[in-house]
């Protein structure tokens, strides 16, 4: 009999330890044959560069986190080489345990009250003109962390008034009203919240989340701040159908969402949900045409597209694949 996993404050649980705590009957079979990556999914990673090392050392120096590293993003080298990073606030331990995600699960530590200012000064030091701020889920906080997002927005605007700010938020489960009150006074320049997958896949892929709740959050933000673009991201390759994805796009548009990212799911480890299929680039192109036909102002669709991948270009309406 396996030893029960202990939840100690500040301890990161990953891979098998994290997956053992997911309260769903279906679990990936570690012995299941892994699909071979097709040619279009093979990229040559650039060697480490001064820019990559500078960004990593800057983050370490200021005790900050990037989702690029914590979620093992395949675009890390490209983005860091371009001098961009997506900052992850409120620590690197998530209270959720989604089996597609590589961010660690556990009991997070208390918020760092100095983080908003440290983040703002780091952004100023790096000379960033467009930043994406995301976070782990913090179901332990009364407002789900909304005020901490707002504090970061205020500090960035104080120290770098020309910098545009996109936030990629959790769903504020059970705390939507508190979060909306916070964002009423401190909206970002772009509000992003990912649906991640089709509703049929939620029980397996997003335990603890609710498809309709996420759509309602996006709708309420748009209703409150009509001038703020709203954005959402979806993965493919978890077992959904293209027809289900098209319905997700329709649902997003019906809830006022302006911008879309659509990319290929990649399995972080053998303990995570397996890739059920690799979607050919031509299908992403077709889905982009569908998205634009539905009225999205911008749709970044391609195998390596992620929520914050070239987010500055997405916000300008430039082509991203």
Swiss-Prot record:
<feature type="binding site">
    <location>
        <position position="68"/>
    </location>
    <ligand>
        <name>[4Fe-4S] cluster 1</name>
    </ligand>
</feature>
<keyword id="KW-0408">Iron</keyword>
<dbReference type="InterPro" id="IPR006638">
    <property type="entry name" value="Elp3/MiaA/NifB-like_rSAM"/>
</dbReference>
<keyword id="KW-0479">Metal-binding</keyword>
<dbReference type="Pfam" id="PF04055">
    <property type="entry name" value="Radical_SAM"/>
</dbReference>
<dbReference type="GO" id="GO:0016992">
    <property type="term" value="F:lipoate synthase activity"/>
</dbReference>
<comment type="similarity">
    <text>Belongs to the radical SAM superfamily. Lipoyl synthase family.</text>
</comment>
<keyword id="KW-0808">Transferase</keyword>
<dbReference type="GO" id="GO:0051539">
    <property type="term" value="F:4 iron, 4 sulfur cluster binding"/>
</dbReference>
<feature type="binding site">
    <location>
        <position position="308"/>
    </location>
    <ligand>
        <name>[4Fe-4S] cluster 1</name>
    </ligand>
</feature>
<dbReference type="InterPro" id="IPR007197">
    <property type="entry name" value="rSAM"/>
</dbReference>
<feature type="binding site">
    <location>
        <position position="98"/>
    </location>
    <ligand>
        <name>[4Fe-4S] cluster 2</name>
    </ligand>
</feature>
<dbReference type="GO" id="GO:0046872">
    <property type="term" value="F:metal ion binding"/>
</dbReference>
<dbReference type="Pfam" id="PF16881">
    <property type="entry name" value="LIAS_N"/>
</dbReference>
<dbReference type="InterPro" id="IPR013785">
    <property type="entry name" value="Aldolase_TIM"/>
</dbReference>
<keyword id="KW-0411">Iron-sulfur</keyword>
<feature type="binding site">
    <location>
        <position position="79"/>
    </location>
    <ligand>
        <name>[4Fe-4S] cluster 1</name>
    </ligand>
</feature>
<feature type="binding site">
    <location>
        <position position="94"/>
    </location>
    <ligand>
        <name>[4Fe-4S] cluster 2</name>
    </ligand>
</feature>
<protein>
    <recommendedName>
        <fullName>Lipoyl synthase</fullName>
        <ecNumber>2.8.1.8</ecNumber>
    </recommendedName>
</protein>
<keyword id="KW-0963">Cytoplasm</keyword>
<keyword id="KW-0949">S-adenosyl-L-methionine</keyword>
<keyword id="KW-0004">4Fe-4S</keyword>
<dbReference type="InterPro" id="IPR031691">
    <property type="entry name" value="LIAS_N"/>
</dbReference>
<feature type="domain" description="Radical SAM core">
    <location>
        <begin position="80"/>
        <end position="297"/>
    </location>
</feature>
<feature type="binding site">
    <location>
        <position position="73"/>
    </location>
    <ligand>
        <name>[4Fe-4S] cluster 1</name>
    </ligand>
</feature>
<comment type="pathway">
    <text>Protein modification; protein lipoylation via endogenous pathway; protein N(6)-(lipoyl)lysine from octanoyl-[acyl-carrier-protein]: step 2/2.</text>
</comment>
<dbReference type="GO" id="GO:0005737">
    <property type="term" value="C:cytoplasm"/>
</dbReference>
<dbReference type="InterPro" id="IPR003698">
    <property type="entry name" value="Lipoyl_synth"/>
</dbReference>
<feature type="binding site">
    <location>
        <position position="101"/>
    </location>
    <ligand>
        <name>[4Fe-4S] cluster 2</name>
    </ligand>
</feature>
């Amino acid at each position: 009999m396996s030893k029960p996993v202990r939840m100690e404050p500040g301890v990161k649980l990953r891979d098998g330890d994290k997956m053992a705590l997911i309260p769903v009957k279906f679990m990936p079979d570690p012995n299941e044959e892994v699909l071979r990556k097709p040619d279009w999914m093979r990229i040559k990673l650039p060697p480490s560069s001064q820019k990559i090392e500078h960004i990593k050392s800057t983050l370490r120096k200021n005790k900050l986190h990037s989702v690029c590293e914590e979620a093992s993003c395949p675009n890390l080298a490209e983005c860091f080489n371009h001098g961009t990073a997506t900052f992850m606030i409120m620590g690197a331990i998530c209270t959720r345990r989604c089996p597609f995600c590589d961010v660690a699960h556990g009991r997070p530590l208390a918020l760092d009250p100095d983080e908003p200012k440290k983040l703002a000064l780091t952004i100023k030091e790096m000379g960033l003109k467009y930043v994406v701020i995301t976070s782990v889920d913090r179901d332990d906080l009364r407002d789900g962390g909304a005020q901490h997002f707002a504090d970061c927005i205020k500090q960035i605007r104080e120290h770098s008034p020309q910098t545009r700010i996109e936030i990629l938020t959790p769903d504020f489960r059970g705390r939507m009203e508190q979060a909306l009150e916070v964002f009423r006074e401190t909206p970002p320049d772009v509000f992003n919240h990912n649906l991640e997958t089709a509703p049929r896949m939620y029980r397996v892929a997003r335990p603890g989340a609710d498809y309709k709740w996420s759509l309602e959050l996006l709708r309420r933000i748009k209703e409150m701040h009509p001038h703020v673009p709203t954005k959402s991201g979806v993965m493919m390759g978890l077992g959904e159908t293209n027809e289900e994805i098209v319905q997700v796009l329709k649902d997003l548009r019906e809830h006022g969402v302006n911008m879309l990212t659509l990319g290929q799911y990649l399995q972080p480890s053998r303990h995570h949900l397996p890739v059920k299929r690799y979607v050919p680039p031509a299908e992403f192109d077709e889905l982009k045409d569908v998205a634009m036909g539905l009225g999205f102002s911008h749709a970044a669709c391609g195998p390596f597209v992620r929520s914050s991948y070239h987010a500055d270009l997405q916000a300008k309406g430039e082509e991203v694949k």
